[in-house]
Structures are given as structure tokens and as C-alpha cells.
Amino acid sequence: MQHAAVCSGTSRHRRTTVTIEKPPATSAPIVEMKDVRRMFGETAAINGVSLSVARGEILGIIGRSGAGKSTLIRCVNGLEKPDTGSIHIEGREITSLDEDALRPVRRRIGMVFQHFNLLSAKTAAQNIALPLKIAGMPKAERIKRVAELLELVGLSDKASHYPAQLSGGQKQRVGIARALAAEPAVLLSDEATSALDPETTQSILALLKDINAKLGLTILLITHEMDVIRRIADRVIVLDHGLIAEEGPVWKVFANPQSPVTQSMLQVLTPELPAIWRNRLEKKGDQAILRVKLSGMAAKGAFFNDVAAATSLAPQLIHGGMDTIQGEPVGTLFIGLPAEDKTKLKAAIGYLNTHADATEVLGYVSGNA
């Protein structure tokens, strides 16, 4: 039997240790959907979606309003039955199950919501205990389990507090503890941080990441915020009008998004050429201004030196930045290249096209870049 020590993952809450059994590793998908379609009238909320989620994975599902995210989650926990397709949870097909047969499946799935959904007349401990009481757990076991969960989420000193006495982040921690009460295999997080301030959002994401790492808990993370995906997801699926527009490891999708909807949603996190340079762009000039997207091995080396050595043109950094996602460097740089020698410039652009994720000539400026 394996055990794991779990900490709350935030400096604003007391870090604690709880011993909880970690599930055994398995290669079989814990969630699998095949050609799932759900219609509302003549509108397909999800339209032939197929996906699989590995045990212990954090899968981010992102899209604009109306993309089908919430419908997809409701299909996973059996609240919506698809019109066609199959859904397997831990190897069991659930679309044909009646409510009685679905009940034990749902106990394997925890839910965290945007608006907390806590009972205002019950304390934090009582809110967490409620699903255990409904499930028939003896009182002594409930008390022990609730204490463990409060410790896990860093709220041991808030057990007797009512929701009105808690901050937004503390309410969400109670919601997470309640979702984990029955020891689910999968946690569905539906916009769980969208009502929180940025600092509290980071503390909740750190808690989810820590729980995932230490317990092996599988998390399906529904959000419209790319920054949430960037911080904790292993893989991302982009939904658009009920279809999967793009999917892949988070760092690869962020480094070089292929679909227009992904590119649009990533704009808020992507550096832009400053206005002082945009206003100078012309069709001809002494310096070519390029946008270069880098990731992986190309971003780890002395990239500018490599360009200069290969083409005899020395790039000049104008603007941009690098980030690290899933341990991989990812970034967008704006560079200037001397444009007098068209042959050398063409060779440099060719080198960039080969070694960078994406290269775009934005225009030219006169004078030094």
C-alpha cells in the first residue's frame, strides 16, 4: 500500500500533512468518450467528440461560451445522456445505465463548481460531511474523514465556520474537500476559479495540482481562461461549436497553436510588437522586423548565435519573452534583421522557418532597429 503526504500548497494557509491511500497506476483510460453527440433541438452542443483521459492526468478543456464545455462535463457524470456515442468511466459504459445503476458511478466522480454551492445554514465541516451522511457512513468515520479533508485543504481552524464567515477562496476549498469526501477517482472542475481574484485563483490551482500529484487524482478542468490551463494542465482540448478544434500537450499547443480559435484565445498571453515599432513598419526598409515563435530544443540553445553563424546576419532582439510550460521553454520574440543583402536575409528567414515553430515578417523599418 502506498501513502502520500499532501500539503495545502499556499503560503496563506497552514501547510499540513495527511496520509491518504494513492490508487494503483494503470494504463487504461479512466474516462473515454467515442463519437459523443448531444443535440438540443437542431443545435449540436457536442458534435461527435472522441477523447480519452489517462489516470492521474489533468486534462484542460477550454472554449468560448457556447462551445460545449459544460454539456461535455454533464455527459461525463451522467447528468446528460448523449444522443449517440459511448462514454466509459473506469471501463464501464454509462450511457445505457438507469439512475440506480449510475449512482455508484457518480460516487467515483467529484464535482467542483464556480459558485461553491455550499449550504449557508451548515458549517464547513457539516457541508463536507453531507455527502458522507447521505452515503450512510457511520458518524465516527464521518468525523474522522471530515477532519482529514479539512486538514488537506488547509482549513482545520475553520471547521465550525459558516459560509458567510469564509472568503471566496476558503469557500472553494470547502467545495473541493466536499468533492473529495467519497474518495473519487475523477474530479470535474467546472470554472472553479472564475469567480476568484488572481491571488486566490493561484492558491486554488496550487492546491489542485498538489492533490493531483500526491494522490494521483484525475482532473478534468473546464475553463475559459488560458492562464489556468498553462499553470496546471498536462494536456488541453480546445472546443469550438461542439467540435474539438485542437488538442495536445499544453506546451506544444501554446508554442504553436494551429486553429484560429486557439490562436484567438491565446492572444491575451502572447506578446505583441510595441506600438512604437508597429507605427514605423513599412513595405521596405533597412531592417526586417520578424515575429519568431520558439519552443523545445530551439529555445534552449543560443538561438541568436546559431542564426548568426548560419547566415552571417546578427539578429537584434526588439521585444518578447520566454516562459516555461511543463518544463519546456516557450516564447515569442520580435527581432530585427539587416535587410540590405536580400540573399542573406532570405537565407536567415529560411533558417528561422526551419528551426523555429513559426516565423512571420511583419514589415520593415528605416534606420537602426
From Swiss-Prot:
Subcellular location(s) per record: Cell inner membrane
Q: Where is ATP annotated to bind?
A: G63, R64, S65, G66, A67, G68, K69, S70
Please tell me where this protein is predominantly located: membrane
TM helices/strands, residue ranges: none
Keyword list (alphabetical) reads: Amino-acid transport, ATP-binding, Cell inner membrane, Cell membrane, Membrane, Nucleotide-binding, Translocase, Transport
What this protein catalyses is: L-methionine(out) + ATP + H2O = L-methionine(in) + ADP + phosphate + H(+); D-methionine(out) + ATP + H2O = D-methionine(in) + ADP + phosphate + H(+)
One GO MF term attached to the UniProt entry: ABC-type D-methionine transporter activity
**EC?**
7.4.2.11
Q: Give GO cellular component annotations, separated by semicolons.
A: plasma membrane
Q: How does it sit in the membrane?
A: Peripheral membrane protein
Pfam families, per the entry: ABC_tran (PF00005), NIL (PF09383)
User: According to the UniProt record, what class of enzyme is this?
Assistant: translocase
> Can you give the residue ranges of the ABC transporter domain?
31-266
What assembly does the database describe for this protein? The complex is composed of two ATP-binding proteins (MetN), two transmembrane proteins (MetI) and a solute-binding protein (MetQ).
Q: What does this protein do?
A: Part of the ABC transporter complex MetNIQ involved in methionine import. Responsible for energy coupling to the transport system.
Query: Which family does this protein fall into?
Result: Belongs to the ABC transporter superfamily. Methionine importer (TC 3.A.1.24) family.
- Protein name according to UniProt: Methionine import ATP-binding protein MetN
